[in-house]
Amino acid sequence: MKNNSIRTVVATGIGAALFIIICIFVNIPIFGNTSIQLQYAVQVLFSVIFGSRSIIGFFMGFIGQVLKDGIQYGDISWAWVLASGITGLVIGLFGKKYDVTMGKFSVMSMIWFNLAQALGLLIAYGVVTPIGDKIQFAQAWSYLYAQSFVAGVANFITIAIGGTLLLAIYASSRTQSGSLTKG
């Protein structure tokens, strides 16, 4: 049990650090303070690999986004912090549907994965970010929903392409269950 706790803390720390670094240095602006964020593909990998402890995906996004906002903007948008965490959490919660640690990532697994990420992003960017930003920044609803929609779509595409590729590569690097036979 203690080993799992250490593994969880280390994975969360490494994941949050990668989240910040990728977010700050690989950033493609598209609308307002919204940009294509490639760190979500890496967050997906951590969320799925440590799916049984999906809290890693949550804290990777949560901590990473807090530090990134603080470093980059000097102000923290708590709705977007929560959205990053929720995205990792939801993807991790459904991780058993697309368990890449066994060396398989079938078309059906890819479909489940993308359905899970769509659900996570719908909650994060369809509900949490517009309402949270309205409370925190009192911006116009039309702007908030436009910004959230653009971010949600950009993140969906990023995760669908980058996340699926990372998971497929990871799965191909694992030994498939039952592929080794006794001689």
UniProtKB/Swiss-Prot annotation:
It comes from the Bacteria. The keyword Manganese does not apply. One of its GO terms (cellular component) is plasma membrane. Its main location: membrane. InterPro entries: ECF_substrate-spec-like, UPF0397. Keywords: Cell membrane, Membrane, Transmembrane, Transmembrane helix. The keyword Cell membrane applies. It is found in: Cell membrane. It is a multi-pass membrane protein. The chain crosses the membrane at residues 11-31, 44-64, 74-94, 111-131, 149-169. Belongs to the UPF0397 family. NCBIfam families: PRK13661.1. This is UPF0397 protein stu0306/stu0307.
